[in-house]
């Protein structure tokens, strides 16, 4: 994997670039649809390519490890062979999912013991077997195993947790370097910066990660309950230290406003389940604000869902989508999910264009307030 930094905004830390993988190029800033179990909920890959114009998707190591399992994935030739997605894939380490399973996991130096949410069977994730698992999945970009402490953790816990994450990172790197890709395409490993909302811990973590010289770096443990101002402050602290010639990935973020604020602060890559989750619940993101398609106000509105959006937005009316949600038709959730994903991709594409034009900050200010309105 390589990263070419193309343009840096003169009025902010926003930048554009190109990530090149063996499965294709990714133009940054980029939003990555979440395909937890190897599929993006309710959206076929043909629609991801043509309507959404997704350049890369995510898979989840925890879920794929449990089902379909490593034997199936290895025999299929990895996730690319299994689901036939022919563009880049990033997998998270599964750590966030394991640590969110409070009451059914046990953390220790070796790794994290947990019980399957499917059948209750016992498992352990270690830095070594998480690297092995992601080799079998075959993602273009692999994530290191880390502990993601709760957003309101006290300093002592955050300090201990960061130490564990750093020791695990060293073990991940060692195992990654000891093993080879299985399917003929290269793979890259991204470390993750943790440290809650403590500036000194975030600085220490960013320096530790930067010294590893990885192909790219991730920022974890944000958007987990802390005020958004604290999240933006942590991004600034971290990006002062992370190398400028490597892509920066903000994990699990977020709203359109969050994404624009993070782009302004030098972040390149984003993922979040919000576009599809909110879409399934009749909430549509637009430049004019968020629309609840169950509201009666749309019943007689025969204008396009979004006249500037993807083809599906242009051919279907708000009234039709309102009807589908009232009738509880599955197509409603599909259309809304496609719209939201396409909007997120359009948002980062527009951001890229304005960074290159030199007016990103002015453009961001002109759109960000409306993005948060309810219609």
Predicted regions span which residues?
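Non-catalytic, usually N-terminal nucleic-acid engagement modules in DNA/RNA processing proteins
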Residues: 1-182, 296
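C-terminal extensions of enzymes
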Residues: 1-20, 26-33, 41-42, 146-152, ...
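Conserved, mostly hydrophobic/aromatic
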Residues: 24, 57, 92, 134, ...
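Short secondary-structure capping/turn micro-motifs that flank functional sites
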Residues: 65, 150-151, 225-226, 278-279, ...
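A non-catalytic, amphipathic alpha-helix used as a structural packing/dimerization or gating element
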Residues: 129, 133, 160, 164-171, ...
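Generic secondary-structure signature for well-ordered alpha-helical cores
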Residues: 139, 170, 174-177, 240-243, ...
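Glycine- and acidic
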Residues: 152-155, 159, 216-222, 330-333
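Glycine-rich phosphate/ribose-binding loops and adjacent secondary-structure elements
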Residues: 163-166, 175, 179, 184-305
């Amino acid at each position: 994997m390589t990263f070419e930094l193309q343009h840096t905004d003169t009025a902010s830390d926003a930048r554009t670039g190109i990530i090149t993988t063996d499965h294709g190029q990714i133009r940054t800033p980029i939003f990555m649809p979440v395909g937890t179990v190897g599929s993006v909920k309710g959206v076929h890959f043909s629609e991801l390519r043509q309507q959404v114009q997704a350049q890369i998707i995510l898979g989840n190591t925890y879920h794929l490890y449990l089902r379909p399992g490593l034997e199936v994935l290895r025999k299929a030739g990895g996730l690319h062979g299994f689901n036939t997605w022919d563009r880049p894939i990033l997998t998270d380490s599964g750590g966030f999912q394991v640590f969110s399973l409070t009451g059914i996991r046990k953390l220790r130096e070796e790794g994290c013991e947990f019980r399957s949410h499917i059948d209750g069977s016992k498992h352990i994730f270690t830095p070594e077997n998480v690297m092995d698992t992601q080799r079998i999945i075959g993602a273009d970009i692999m994530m290191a195993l880390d502990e993601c402490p709760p957003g309101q953790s006290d300093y002592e816990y955050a300090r201990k947790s960061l130490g564990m994450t750093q020791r695990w990172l060293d073990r991940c790197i060692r195992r990654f370097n000891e093993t080879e890709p299985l399917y003929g395409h290269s793979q890259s490993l991204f470390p993750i910066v943790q440290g809650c909302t403590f500036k000194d811990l975030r600085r220490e973590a960013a320096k530790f990660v930067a010294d590893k010289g990885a192909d790219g770096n991730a920022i974890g443990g944000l958007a987990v309950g802390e005020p958004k101002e604290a999240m933006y402050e942590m991004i600034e602290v971290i990006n002062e230290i992370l190398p400028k010639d490597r892509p920066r990935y903000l994990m699990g973020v977020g709203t359109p406003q969050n994404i624009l604020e993070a782009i302004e602060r030098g972040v390149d890559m984003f993922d979040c389940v919000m576009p599809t989750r909110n879409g399934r619940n009749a909430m549509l993101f637009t430049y004019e604000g968020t629309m609840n398609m169950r509201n009666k106000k749309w019943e007689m509105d025969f204008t396009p869902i979004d006249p500037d959006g993807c083809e599906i937005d242009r051919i279907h009316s708000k009234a039709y989508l309102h009807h589908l949600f009232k009738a509880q038709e599955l197509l409603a959730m599909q259309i809304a999910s496609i719209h939201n994903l396409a909007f997120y991709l359009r948002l980062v594409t527009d951001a890229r264009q304005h960074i290159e034009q030199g007016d990103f900050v002015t453009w961001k200010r002109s759109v960000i307030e409306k993005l948060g309105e309810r219609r």
